[in-house]
Amino acid sequence: MSTRTVKVGGIDIANDRPFVLFGGMNVLESRDLALQVAESYVKVTQKLGIPYVFKASFDKANRSSINSYRGPGLDEGLRIFEEIKRTFNVPVITDIHEPHQAQPVAEVADIIQLPAFLSRQTDLVAAMARTGCPVNIKKAQFLAPQEMKHILSKCEEAGNDQLILCERGSSFGYNNLVVDMLGFGIMKQFGYPVFFDVTHSLQMPGGLSSSAGGRREQVVQLARSGMAVGLAGLFLEAHPDPDVAKCDGPCALRLSQLEPFLAQMKALDDMVKQFPNIDTA
């Protein structure tokens, strides 16, 4: 099976390469906290030899409640991202929600992300693709993995083949998500790098009435399962104190657990990618 390589700075992202980490926090809560989180990730990933891209949102436009915290907004968010890039010399990934945000975000971010809920919005997809920036496409909770080929085609038609697919769980009844491990293999057949967003796959959407619940206690088991497939990368959110995080705290890893967690993921990835392929078709 052929696999494309997406290049971000000095990082090669591909299903047959050592895994890349898209890691950070769910939403920018403050400049100081963002710098603290980025510094922790940089120290751990450098120690373990894991290629790293910082991630966070400047606006959470799809919160459950009108009263929920959304973020600092586009302008302040981009200023924080620029400072993180300067300070730590790392690439940045962030998501957008409207077509007019694509170009200004692409001028700062190294990867722009298509949110799962918006992944079929053609105008948004086309605007992101036309920037020429690599695009991380989140698989919607309501889409089958086979359907992701249509979103890839929209990006390709707009002239962009620097594309990444990202699994983040599928709706399973009300207030629940599950991960179909067979979906990774289906999406890998399209030839693009495939990531696993283990954090959001642990969500229980609307599970706390006015916000999403989560199952942080199962993050290690689920991440191990995904990494055993042999993926281009892992998408992870961590927080110094998840219980007071302003968004998706119930899913976030404790920042203090980052090193032992990533050490396990790297060991598993290294082992899996040493195995020869067995064609059972």
Curated annotation (Swiss-Prot):
Subcellular location per the Swiss-Prot or TrEMBL entry: Cytoplasm
EC number: 2.5.1.55
Enzyme class: transferase
One GO location term (cellular component): cytoplasm
The organism's place on the tree of life at top rank: Bacteria
Gene Ontology biological-process annotations: keto-3-deoxy-D-manno-octulosonic acid biosynthetic process
Keywords in alphabetical order: Cytoplasm, Lipopolysaccharide biosynthesis, Transferase
InterPro entries: Aldolase_TIM, DAHP1/KDSA, KDO8P_synthase
Organism expressing this protein natively: Hahella chejuensis (strain KCTC 2396)
Name of the protein in its database record: 2-dehydro-3-deoxyphosphooctonate aldolase
Recorded GO MF terms: 3-deoxy-8-phosphooctulonate synthase activity
Pathway participation: Carbohydrate biosynthesis; 3-deoxy-D-manno-octulosonate biosynthesis; 3-deoxy-D-manno-octulosonate from D-ribulose 5-phosphate: step 2/3; Bacterial outer membrane biogenesis; lipopolysaccharide biosynthesis
Catalytic activities: D-arabinose 5-phosphate + phosphoenolpyruvate + H2O = 3-deoxy-alpha-D-manno-2-octulosonate-8-phosphate + phosphate
HAMAP family (alphabetical): KDO8P_synth (MF_00056)
Assigned protein family: Belongs to the KdsA family.
